[in-house]
A protein has these predicted regions:
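Well-ordered beta-strand positions in beta-sheet-rich domains
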Residues: 18-20
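Glycine-rich beta-strand-centered segment in the early N-terminal region that forms part
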Residues: 24-38, 48-99, 103-104
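Active-site phosphate-binding/coordination module
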Residues: 44
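Short solvent-exposed loop/turn micro-motifs enriched in small/polar/acidic residues
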Residues: 1-2, 16
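Extracellular beta-rich ligand/substrate-recognition surface
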Residues: 8-16
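NAD(P)H dinucleotide-binding glycine-rich loop of Rossmann-like/cofactor-binding domains
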Residues: 23, 77, 92-134
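Short structural boundary motif marking the start of a folded domain
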Residues: 2-8
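Conserved Rossmann-like nucleotide-cofactor binding loop
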Residues: 41
Length: 134
């Protein structure tokens, strides 16, 4: 029998419920995080109002704080039992900023009027990568 977890799931417009879901498997590049605190984001409210088309049963929430329960074999720089935050913005590693090693939180860029930002970026976000949460 699969181990289960509780998750907030979109059921229908105006209705989100806590449901039981199987705990996902951890692949070589994954981390399993036990959520201890999370936020309610504007995205969650848009989903609740039916303004974003999502399938019933979708697990919502994307800005949690928690503890690493299990790490994949290829994950480096973290340890099981460590408190972490999962950011809502993740790079696809195809942008010029990501290919240059700039984290997505710092890879925002401003495009001057009449100019193209396709090949440039300017770090403006101000997040520090690797902050500790205690």
């Amino acid at each position: 029998m699969a181990r289960m977890m509780r998750a907030a799931a979109f059921i229908e417009k105006g209705r989100i419920e806590l449901v039981d879901k199987p705990i996902p498997d951890v692949g070589p590049n994954d981390a399993l995080m036990r959520i201890t605190t999370t936020t309610i984001c504007g995205t969650d409210l848009h989903i609740l109002k039916g303004e974003y088309p999502v399938a019933p049963g979708l697990t919502i929430g994307h800005e949690p704080v928690g503890v690493i329960e299990k790490l994949g074999s290829a994950v480096k720089g973290y340890r099981e039992g460590q408190r972490v935050i999962a950011g809502a913005i993740c790079p696809n590693f195809n942008s010029y900023a990501a290919q240059d090693g700039v984290p997505s939180q710092d890879g925002s860029y401003l495009i001057p009027e009449g100019k193209c930002g396709a090949h440039g970026y300017k770090a403006t976000a101000g997040w520090r990568f690797g902050n500790w949460i205690d």
